[in-house]
């Protein structure tokens, strides 16, 4: 899980989700997991 100020989709399979006001990106590739901090 990477914590970044700006989160972007890295590949086509990345999906953007908003969970209680945090933007989270989940993907089949575990290296692409991100959340906004």
Swiss-Prot record:
One of its GO terms (molecular function) is structural constituent of ribosome. GO terms for biological process: translation. It is found in: Plastid, Chloroplast. InterPro entries: Ribosomal_bL36, Ribosomal_bL36_sp. Keywords: Chloroplast, Plastid, Ribonucleoprotein, Ribosomal protein. Pfam families: Ribosomal_L36 (PF00444). One of its GO terms (cellular component) is ribosome. Its main location: plastid. Belongs to the bacterial ribosomal protein bL36 family. PANTHER family: 50S RIBOSOMAL PROTEIN L36, CHLOROPLASTIC (PTHR42888), LARGE RIBOSOMAL SUBUNIT PROTEIN BL36C (PTHR42888:SF1). HAMAP family: Ribosomal_bL36. NCBIfam families: rpmJ_bact. This is Large ribosomal subunit protein bL36c. It comes from Gracilaria tenuistipitata var. liui.
């Amino acid at each position: 899980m990477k914590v970044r100020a700006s989160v972007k989709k890295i590949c086509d399979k990345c999906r953007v989700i908003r969970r209680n006001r945090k933007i989270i990106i989940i993907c089949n590739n575990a290296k692409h997991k991100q959340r906004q901090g």
